[in-house]
């Protein structure tokens, strides 16, 4: 649960999470020079955690995964959570993903933060689906007093400026109810290449744009997200979300104070 941040609070150490998405490491849309700038900028930030919310590839081929892996490995960060997107599930790409990046759904815990990565893809389909068979596992992972982060490729709420909307998970309503019931603090998504933020019943939902491709919507630049969390192990703290532009510049898009129920 969050409320608007006030002034005059004592400065505390931040935990930094970088959220990138939709790399699509294959021609003709991938921009290698921009990918270099993304890596350079992330390494300057020195985040504790990096989350990649899918679409590492264009068509799910092994050489695309290897190329994406090469870039991700150059990010200087001890904790990396990588999950697949719908493009990664094409051409049995989910098998290559598992071999290179491990399980498609996973949980990581670090410094008072629990991150639950969920595979929302289906083979050779753009539509998303989490699946009831995962609900019990998700709920178990979120039974913690940590700052709770859930990451999945498909956004759970439609995103403006994306045209006809048909790509939220088929069970988005059930997943939203589950995450809110589990008092999830933050949800990270990608998919439509348009950055956006929703605040739903105190749960912040952050959509990332594409980090380093030319597959951008009109008048929207490539970007990734930086999330700063003051002392996640404490009952109160401030979250700040910045939109980072690899071509230069940044923008503070959200500042909220966390208040545990």
Language model feature labels by segment:
Residues 2-71, 140-144:
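N-terminal active-site segment of His-dependent metallophosphoesterases
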Residues 12-18, 107-117, 143-147, 199-205:
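Beta-strand-turn-beta hairpins that frame and shape the catalytic cleft
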Residues 19-21, 50-55, 80-86, 119, ...:
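Active-site neighborhood of phospho(di)ester-bond hydrolases with catalytic His/Asp-centered motifs
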Residues 26-29, 58-63, 86-93, 123-126, ...:
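Active-site environment of divalent metal-dependent phosphoester hydrolases
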Residues 62-144, 174-180, 226:
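Extended active-site neighborhood of metal-dependent phosphoesterases/phosphodiesterases
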Residues 144-161:
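Short acidic, glycine-rich surface-loop motifs adjacent to enzyme active sites
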Residues 164-235:
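Conserved beta-sheet core of the metallophosphoesterase superfamily
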Residues 230-261:
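A short C-terminal boundary segment appended to hydrolase-like catalytic domains
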């Amino acid at each position: 649960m969050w409320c608007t941040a006030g002034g005059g609070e004592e400065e505390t150490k931040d935990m930094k999470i970088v959220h990138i998405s939709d790399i699509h490491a294959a021609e003709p849309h991938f921009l290698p020079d921009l990918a270099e700038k993304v890596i350079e900028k992330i390494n300057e930030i020195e985040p504790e955690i990096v989350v990649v919310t899918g679409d590492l590839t264009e068509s799910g081929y092994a050489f695309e995964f290897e190329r994406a892996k090469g870039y991700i490995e150059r990010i200087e960060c001890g904790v990396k959570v990588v999950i697949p997107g719908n493009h990664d599930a094409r051409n049995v790409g989910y098998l290559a993903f598992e071999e290179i990046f491990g399980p498609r759904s996973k949980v990581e815990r670090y410094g008072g933060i629990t991150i639950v990565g969920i595979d929302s893809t289906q083979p050779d389909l753009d539509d998303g689906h989490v699946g009831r068979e995962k609900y019990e596992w998700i709920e178990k992972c979120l039974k913690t007093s940590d700052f709770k982060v859930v990451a999945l490729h498909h956004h759970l709420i439609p995103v403006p400026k994306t045209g006809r909307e048909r790509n939220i998970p088929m069970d988005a309503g059930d997943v939203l109810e589950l995450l809110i019931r589990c008092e999830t603090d933050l949800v990270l998504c990608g998919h439509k290449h348009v950055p956006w933020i929703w605040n739903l019943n105190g749960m912040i939902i952050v959509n990332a744009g594409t980090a380093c491709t030319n597959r951008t919507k009109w008048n929207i630049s490539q970007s990734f997200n930086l999330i700063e969390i003051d002392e996640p192990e404490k009952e109160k703290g401030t979250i700040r979300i910045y939109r980072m532009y690899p071509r230069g510049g940044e923008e503070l898009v959200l500042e909220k104070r966390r208040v545990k129920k």
